[in-house]
């Protein structure tokens, strides 16, 4: 559906800018020049000045000498595939090599910044054909340069655009074009795009030079091309998208369920008045057979649509496929074995450890004789035999085990991970005690917490609770209101048991945290019945195991909220509308598009993969996390409280009470907890991004009125809100876009979310969560009450009870395999402070220089983070058995490194 037009009406860009006004101005100037031109004649030794009539001016223009032509050379850099599919690639490549010789070529044409006064259209070169395509068709290098000789008139001016028609059968990936031979020097066209065959996309592709232009500064010869390119990218909101398409449009999340498989696979539509949610990329697929409001499913290995240039490049796709292969193998074997065996629980912690040392085969007791009896695909057995020691089927040892195998058991490590782990964004300063729920008491029972002063006062170093709050010593992670409305349904699921948890922490004099109470809440069964219980640090063996179970439930709550709310909703889903709107409303020559471009890479592709495999009905999130089929409803419930104006790091820290404004402090903030690794490192990166964006914005918008008058920019921001976040479009907290400072703030927030915030929340998933007891994604048992029949089994063998409460073997291995893949950097990762074609991405030398300064600042920050991780006074990141905090260290190599800040949400 044409959702954008339904909500927004016609785009601002749909108001065509006529070139006639500019041509008339040009003609007026020419006539004036002719009027002022004096013809000197000598007659009888004196100079006679003759006036020139309008007719003579016109005649002079007609008789103007025809310009001569000269030749310039185009060099096109095309990237080859490393591995070709025989039928898709090899055969078509050979066909293209043959047909290229008979005229089915790649044709290019240059367009000038200037217009031809006679045609009132851009000056154009002759069409030219790429040379030697057939000769170079078998070249195996990663990149191949093709050339073309182009004839242009001497008055052509400066080239501003180039069109390409690919008359071959096969698409090709075009990295750059350089034009040589003009007096102005080499002209660069950064492309980084798939050029489709004209049989798929008949219109020629348009590429612009690296010179950025605001809309009202667009050279007159490029205006119609600028409009046409955006029109092509918007589409008309109808039809089923093909994988070769380049169209960006919006839709709701109506493709997570599969009603055609039965009621168990029905999921509500996310997005709309009933369940608000951000919009996703439209595919146009037909409805399901049984529910016209649900889009039909496309299951792996078949891909969902995203615009062609959003799809993974080859090295990224290969790395992701390898990770998925490992995940498939890790999932396949346990599922086969558990299908023939009822032994589905871990028998001891040593069995969990064996997943890393022995691999999946030995962990499952699959010796060679038993292995041969299982109905495994030949591929699996061959991989096992060929991989050295079965390495492909082993799990890497998570970093949480690398320094101290038993760190996860300690209270101080449980607390440390709330500020230096994979989810450091839930903790808040405790402001009210006891905590109070904001839920409707008619539906969810009393709002009062069961926490009392007597529960925690003994752990406050002689302070009262009131004193501890006033001295900023108490903190809380509160999941009560997020989970409680869903608990009845969650706990009715087979093998799922959950509480709505609150955990209170006390700040020690050393700067570390310790948990002092955990509240576990269930829905009230009957009015007046007890539904809450409070646990405090243990004093004996029995209370120790109860405390460990309570911590596990708190971690399970945290794992779900982290994945569904902070990770997917607040980064992946919330950013997608801004990306869609950028492609639809900002020309590739717009300076703000050039700024955002590296921060949009791969996000649409990874989000469609999430819809297909992770957040869908019976997908990984439902299978591995406590909320099960209700997980995305929890995510949508949190969206009602999402606020873009509070998503920047300083605003978020202030909102959570973790910092207060202080102009005298670095970054203008004073952290309430000085040794808060995520916040202290994050503020350095935030400030670097902010300074870079401010320099960039002020360069192109020296006058704030230019921001208001930039029709593309305003259309982008308006569409992001009114269409992409349509369900919250009437909120009064949306920032205005009325000047350079507003624009700097909006862009800094978007870049922060896409880069550092996502990195902090994503790349620690396996290093911390790969050891299931440290961070169980789901729980299968509640804490036993003394009067419960199962209390005796807990009392007799608490370790067995604890392990039976954790995810099963199958659930654990599936989760471990997936988060291992999701925590991995690909070889082509582009990190903050880097970008493709560093020297030529922009034709503005001052901006290129400013980017190098930004890169240097990022490198300085990396060294500062290394220094902090060696500072023994910072006990939350340095100490015996303590993992250094590197999730915001900017650079990384490939793999699950627990560090590295990519430019974009690329995994």
From Swiss-Prot:
Residues 85-209 form the PLAT domain. Its EC number is 1.13.11.-. PROSITE patterns: LIPOXYGENASE_1, LIPOXYGENASE_2, LIPOXYGENASE_3, PLAT. It catalyses: (9Z,12Z,15Z)-octadecatrienoate + O2 = 13-hydroperoxy-(9Z,11E,15Z)-octadecatrienoate. Pathway: Lipid metabolism; oxylipin biosynthesis; Isoprenoid biosynthesis. Its main location: plastid. GO terms for biological process: fatty acid biosynthetic process; isoprenoid biosynthetic process; lipid oxidation; oxylipin biosynthetic process. Gene3D superfamilies: 3.10.450.60, Lipoxygenase-1, Domain 2, Lipoxygenase-1, Domain 3, Lipoxygenase-1, Domain 5, PLAT/LH2 domain. This is Lipoxygenase 1, chloroplastic. The lineage of its organism: Eukaryota, Viridiplantae, Streptophyta, Embryophyta, Tracheophyta.
């Amino acid at each position: 559906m044409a959702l954008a037009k339904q909500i927004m009406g016609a785009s601002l860009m749909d108001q065509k800018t006529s070139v006639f006004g500019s041509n008339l101005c040009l003609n007026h100037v020419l006539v004036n020049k002719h009027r002022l031109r004096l013809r000197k004649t000598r007659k009888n030794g004196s100079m006679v000045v003759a006036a020139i009539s309008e007719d003579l001016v016109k005649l002079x223009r007609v008789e103007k000498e025809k310009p001569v032509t000269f030749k310039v050379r185009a060099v096109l850099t095309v990237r080859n595939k490393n591995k070709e599919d025989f039928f898709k690639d090899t055969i078509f490549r050979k066909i293209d090599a043959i047909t290229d010789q008979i005229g089915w070529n790649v044709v290019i044409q240059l367009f000038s910044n200037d217009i031809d006064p006679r045609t009132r259209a851009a000056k154009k070169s002759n069409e030219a054909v790429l040379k030697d395509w057939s000769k170079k068709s078998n070249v195996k290098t990663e990149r191949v340069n093709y050339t073309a000789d182009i004839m242009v008139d001497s008055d052509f001016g400066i080239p501003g655009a180039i069109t390409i028609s690919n008359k071959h059968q096969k698409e090709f990936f075009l990295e750059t074009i350089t034009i040589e031979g003009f007096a102005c020097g080499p002209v660069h066209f950064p492309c980084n795009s798939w050029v489709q065959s004209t049989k798929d996309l008949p219109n020629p592709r348009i590429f612009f030079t690296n010179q950025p232009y605001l809309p009202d500064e667009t050279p007159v010869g490029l205006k119609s091309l600028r409009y046409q390119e955006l029109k092509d990218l918007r589409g008309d909101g109808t039809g089923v998208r093909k994988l070769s398409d380049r169209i960006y449009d919006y839709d709701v999340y109506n493709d997570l369920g599969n009603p055609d498989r039965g009621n168990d696979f029905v999921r509500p539509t996310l997005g709309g008045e009933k369940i608000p949610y951000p919009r996703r990329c439209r595919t146009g697929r037909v409805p399901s057979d049984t529910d016209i409001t649900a889009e039909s499913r496309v299951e792996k290995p078949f891909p969902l649509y995203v615009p062609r240039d959003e799809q993974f490049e080859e090295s990224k796709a290969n790395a992701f496929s390898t990770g998925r292969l490992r995940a498939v193998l890790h999932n396949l074997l346990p599922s086969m074995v558990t299908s023939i065996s009822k032994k589905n629980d871990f028998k001891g912690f040593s069995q969990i450890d064996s997943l890393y040392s022995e691999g999946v085969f030995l962990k499952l007791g699959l010796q060679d004789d038993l292995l041969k009896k299982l109905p495994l695909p030949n591929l699996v057995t061959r991989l096992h035999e060929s991989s050295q020691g079965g390495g492909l089927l082993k799990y890497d040892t998570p970093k949480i085990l690398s320094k101290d195998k038993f760190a996860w058991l300690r209270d101080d490590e449980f607390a440390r991970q709330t500020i230096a782990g994979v989810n450091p964004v839930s903790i808040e300063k405790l402001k009210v005690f006891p905590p109070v729920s904001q839920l409707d008491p008619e539906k969810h029972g009393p709002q009062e917490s069961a926490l009392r002063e007597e529960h925690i006062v003994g752990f406050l170093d002689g302070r009262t609770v009131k004193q501890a709050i006033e001295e900023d010593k108490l903190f809380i992670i509160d999941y009560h209101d997020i989970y409680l409305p869903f608990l009845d349904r969650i706990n009715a699921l087979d093998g799922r048991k959950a509480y709505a948890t609150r955990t209170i922490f006390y700040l020690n004099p050393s700067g570390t945290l310790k948990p002092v109470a955990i509240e576990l809440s269930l829905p009230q069964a009957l009015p007046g019945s007890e539904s809450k219980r409070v646990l405090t640090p243990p004093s004996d063996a029995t209370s120790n195991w109860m405390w460990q179970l309570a911590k596990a439930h708190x971690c399970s709550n945290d794992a779900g909220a982290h994945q569904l709310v902070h990770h997917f909703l607040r980064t992946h889903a919330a950013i997608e509308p801004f990306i869609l709107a950028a492609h639809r409303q900002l020309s590739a020559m717009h300076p703000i598009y050039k700024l955002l471009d590296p921060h949009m890479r791969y996000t649409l592709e990874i989000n469609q993969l999430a819809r297909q495999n992770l957040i869908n009905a019976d997908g990984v999130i439902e299978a591995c996390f406590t909320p099960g089929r209700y997980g995305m409803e929890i995510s949508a419930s949190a969206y009602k409280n999402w606020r873009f104006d509070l998503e920047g790091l300083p605003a978020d820290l202030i909102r959570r009470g973790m910092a207060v404004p202080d102009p005298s402090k670095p970054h203008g903030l004073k952290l309430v907890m000085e040794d808060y690794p995520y916040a202290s490192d994050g503020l350095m990166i935030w400030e670097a991004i902010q300074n870079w964006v401010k320099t960039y914005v002020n360069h192109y918008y020296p006058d704030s009125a230019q921001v208001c008058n930039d029709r593309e920019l305003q259309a982008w921001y308006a569409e992001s809100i009114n269409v992409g976040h349509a369900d919250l479009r009437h909120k009064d907290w949306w920032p205005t876009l009325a000047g350079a400072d507003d624009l700097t703030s909006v862009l800094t927030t978007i870049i922060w979310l896409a880069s550092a915030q996502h990195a902090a929340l994503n790349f620690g998933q396996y290093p911390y969560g790969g050891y299931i007891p440290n961070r169980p994604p789901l729980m299968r048992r509640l804490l036993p009450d003394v009067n419960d029949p199962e209390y005796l089994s807990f009392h007799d063998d608490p370790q067995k009870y604890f392990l039976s409460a954790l995810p099963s073997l199958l659930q654990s291995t599936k989760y471990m395999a997936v988060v291992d893949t999701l925590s991995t950097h690909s070889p082509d990762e582009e990190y903050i402070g880097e970008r493709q074609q560093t020297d030529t991405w922009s034709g503005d030398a001052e901006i290129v220089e400013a980017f190098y300064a930004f890169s240097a600042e990022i490198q300085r920050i990396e060294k500062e983070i290394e220094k902090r991780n060696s500072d023994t006074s910072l006990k939350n990141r340095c100490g015996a058995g303590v993992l250094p905090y590197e999730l915001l260290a900017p650079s990384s190599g490939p793999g699950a490194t627990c560090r590295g800040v990519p430019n974009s949400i690329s995994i």
